[in-house]
Amino acid sequence: MALIELRHVKKEFSGKAGKVTALKDIDLTVESGDIYGIIGYSGAGKSTLVRLLNGLETPTEGEVEIQGQDIALLPNKELRNFRKKIGMIFQHFNLLWSRTVLENIMLPLEIAGVPKQNRKSRAEELIKLVGLEGRETAYPSQLSGGQKQRVGIARALANNPDILLCDEATSALDPQTTDEVLELLLKINQELNLTVVLITHEMHVIRKICNRVAVMEYGEIVEEGKVIDIFKKPQTEIAKRFIQQEADKNIEETELVVEEMLEQYPNGKIVRLLFHGEQAKLPIISHIVQEYQVEVSIIQGNIQQTKQGAVGSLYIQLLGEEQNILAAIEGLRKLRVETEVIGNE
C-alpha cells in the first residue's frame, strides 16, 4: 500500500533574478514499510523534497499525499498534529547540548504535553532500542558521532511516527559508524514496520539497506527502480557515475588496462560480464574454459552486496578460435549473464 505519493510536483522559489525552479514534475511512490532511497549531488533538489514531505514547504504545483491526505490542504493545527507522525534525523544531529541523552529524547514528548513519567519510560525504551544503555546521563559533548546519531534516531521515534526521514544522516560519520547506523535503521524498519526515506549522496548507503531508489539531478527524478536493477543496468549517466564510484573505483585504471590488452592481443575479445543473484555464485569462468576451449584472462572484477542480492561485474579477455569465442559468449548469455563485448569485435 502506498504511504507516500507525489504527483506532478513542482516547487519554485522567488529570487532577485526571478523564479528558481527547485523541483520539476516529481512523481514518487513509497510503499508502507519500505526503505526508500533518494540520491543526488548537491543542488539536485533533495532537501527541498524533504521539506515537502514534512510539510515545511508546499508545492507550487502538484500533490504531496501522505497516508491518503494532501498535506498542503491541511489547516495549521492539523498539520502540526500530522508532523508528529513523521520523525526526522539530520547530518549534524541537532541535539541540545545542555540536556542529557535521556532529556534530549524526552524533548518531543515534553512539547507534546506527555506526562513526565510517561516521557521517561518511553525514552528509556528508546535508549534500549538504539543501544545506548548506560549513557542516559551523558551529555552530547561526551558522545561519539555515532552515539549522537543514535540519540537523534531515538528522539525522532519518540512520538511513534509512521515515517522516518533521514537527511544525509550518515554524511558526518566514518565508514564503520555509518554501517552501524544503517544496521540500526534496518533493525528499526523491521521491528517497528517503520517506513524510512533516506536522502543521501552516497551510493553505499543506498546499496546497504534500501529496496528502491530515485536518482535526482537538477530538480528532476531521472531514474527510479529497485536498487538491484539500478546496479545491474543503470540507464542514465548520473546513475552510472554513482555506481562507478561505489562499485568500480578503479574504472579509469580498467580502461587503461583494456586499451593495453587490446594492443597486445588483437585477436581476442574483451568482454564485460554482469551477473546477479544465483549467477554470482556460479563457477562461470571454469565453465566456459572447459566447455568452449577458450583461454580466459581476468582484467578486473568486483562483487557488491545489495539488500536484494549480489551484483557482480567482471572484465575478461577471451582468447582462442573465433568460433569458440563466439560460442562462449552465447553460452554466457544462456546462463543469463549479461555480456557486453567492449573490444576487438
UniProtKB/Swiss-Prot annotation:
Domain spans labelled ABC transporter: 4-243
Annotated catalysed reactions: L-methionine(out) + ATP + H2O = L-methionine(in) + ADP + phosphate + H(+); D-methionine(out) + ATP + H2O = D-methionine(in) + ADP + phosphate + H(+)
GO cellular component, one term: plasma membrane
Predominant subcellular localization, coarse grouping: membrane
Entry's Gene Ontology molecular function annotations: ABC-type D-methionine transporter activity; ATP binding; ATP hydrolysis activity
UniProt KW keywords: Amino-acid transport, ATP-binding, Cell membrane, Membrane, Nucleotide-binding, Translocase, Transport
Matches recorded under InterPro entries: AAA+_ATPase (IPR003593), ABC_transporter-like_ATP-bd (IPR003439), ABC_transporter-like_CS (IPR017871), ACT-like_dom_sf (IPR045865), MetN_ABC (IPR041701), MetN_ABC_transporter-like (IPR050086), NIL_domain (IPR018449), P-loop_NTPase (IPR027417)
Residues holding ATP: G40, Y41, S42, G43, A44, G45, K46, S47
Membrane topology term: Peripheral membrane protein
Nucleotide-binding among keywords: yes
Family: Belongs to the ABC transporter superfamily. Methionine importer (TC 3.A.1.24) family.
General function of this protein: Part of the ABC transporter complex MetNIQ involved in methionine import. Responsible for energy coupling to the transport system.
Protein's UniProt name: Methionine import ATP-binding protein MetN 2
Organism taxonomic ancestry: Bacteria, Bacillati, Bacillota, Bacilli, Lactobacillales
